[in-house]
Each structure stands twice: as C-alpha cells, then as structure tokens.
C-alpha cells in the first residue's frame, strides 16, 4: 500500500 486513503493493491486493506 502506497497511502491509507488510496486504493492501490488491496482495496479492503485500509
């Protein structure tokens, strides 16, 4: 993950 507010690899990883 690049950023907590960005959907990058895992959309559910936040």
Swiss-Prot record:
Q: Which GO terms describe its biological process?
A: cysteine biosynthetic process
| E.C. designation(s) | 2.3.1.30
The broad enzyme category this protein falls into is: transferase
The UniProt GO MF terms for this protein read: serine O-acetyltransferase activity
Query: What pathway does the UniProt record associate with this protein?
Result: Amino-acid biosynthesis; L-cysteine biosynthesis; L-cysteine from L-serine: step 1/2
Q: Which UniProt keywords apply?
A: Acyltransferase, Amino-acid biosynthesis, Transferase
Catalytic reactions of this protein: L-serine + acetyl-CoA = O-acetyl-L-serine + CoA
Query: What do we know about how this protein assembles, alone or with others?
Result: Homomultimer.
Q: Which family does it belong to?
A: Belongs to the transferase hexapeptide repeat family.
Q: What is the name listed in the Swiss-Prot or TrEMBL entry for this protein?
A: Probable serine acetyltransferase
């Amino acid at each position: 993950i690049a950023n907590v507010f960005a959907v990058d690899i895992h959309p559910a990883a936040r």
